[in-house]
């Protein structure tokens, strides 16, 4: 003993991580990833092109960035000592390659968006396979949310977009009728047509707010994962997105209608109608984050009122020191 105090240092990865992913295994993982990306390069290029050309799918290129951030910030909780799982990994890689071959054969019958969606789905399956093949089942389980979140990088197929738009348009028209009545403006609704004094409003495809609602849904999923302690509260937050999106659409329709009634039908060309979407989207974030804060605050209040339960929970989470 030299009398100097012993200082414990915490490694970047848990003990055993270097042995698990080091050496040839790490390089094999990198090589497999590069090889898969090379095979799917035309699909990736089409995916980026779609994101840059279509506002509805412009968010998809951010999804891998978010997943990567979650993996990096949560790296200490990942099961780096997990053993490779060649059977499920190899099966998923082969499934992804078979899927891309089938998609290429069925290409003439598919729309541009559906083609990109299927190709990116095949790529994602192959990437999951690489994860199992080189990092193992336990690692994939510990990285469940970031890896599953990659599903959002697949563009919504045309059929899904059509059904979601129809639902949002009809629901927004129905709620708008009630909002006009509450606001004191006479209204007569027939389907998606709203007749108010001086003008007839049609809740069209552009009024569905599908892009804002979809982005809000993805935002709520991330917020629930980061800030809410239980799946139940996370589901409450995510489940509030669609009603919130419909309410946002209805309030916007009411504002446009009120402007037309008060100042003349030419107000249909007002910026609120043409370019007001981002403003109402930001406004819809306020109640969403207030709900997230309320759900999180409820947990903190419960822990403050029952410290014994929190102490028991803390003891369960402490590692065995014996």
Locate predicted features.
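Hydrophobic N-terminal alpha-helices or hydrophobic patches in metabolic proteins across all domains
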Residues: 2-322
């Amino acid at each position: 003993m030299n009398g100097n105090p012993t200082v414990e240092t915490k490694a970047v990865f848990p003990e055993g991580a270097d042995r698990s992913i080091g050496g040839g295994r790490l390089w094999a993982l990198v090589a497999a990833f590069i090889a898969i990306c090379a095979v799917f390069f035309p699909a990736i290029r089409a995916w980026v092109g779609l994101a840059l050309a279509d506002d509805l799918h412009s968010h998809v290129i951010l999804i891998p960035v978010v997943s990567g951030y979650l993996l990096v910030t949560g790296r200490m909780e990942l099961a780096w000592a997990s053993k490779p799982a060649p059977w499920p990994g190899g099966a998923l890689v082969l499934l992804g390659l078979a899927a891309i071959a089938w998609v290429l054969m069925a290409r003439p019958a598919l729309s541009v968006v559906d083609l990109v969606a299927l190709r990116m789905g095949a790529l994602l399956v192959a990437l999951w396979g690489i994860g199992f093949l080189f990092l193992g089942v336990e690692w994939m389980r510990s990285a469940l949310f970031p890896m599953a979140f990659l599903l959002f990088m697949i563009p919504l197929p045309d059929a899904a977009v059509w059904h979601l738009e129809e639902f949002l348009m009809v629901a927004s028209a129905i709620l708008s009728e009630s909002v006009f009545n509450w606001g004191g403006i006479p209204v007569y609704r027939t389907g998606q047509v709203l007749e108010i004094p001086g003008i007839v409003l049609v809740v069209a495809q552009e009024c569905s707010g599908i892009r804002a609602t979809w982005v809000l849904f993805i935002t709520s999923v991330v917020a629930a994962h980061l800030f809410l302690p239980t799946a139940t509260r996370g589901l409450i937050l995510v489940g509030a997105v669609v009603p919130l999106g419909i309410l946002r659409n209805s309030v916007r329709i009411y504002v446009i209608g009120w402007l037309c009634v008060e100042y003349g039908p030419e107000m249909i060309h007002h910026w609120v109608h043409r370019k007001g979407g981002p403003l109402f989207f930001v406004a819809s974030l306020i109640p969403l984050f207030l709900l997230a804060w309320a759900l999180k605050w409820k947990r903190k209040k419960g822990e403050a009122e029952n410290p014994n339960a929190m102490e028991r929970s803390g003891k369960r989470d402490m590692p065995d020191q014996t």
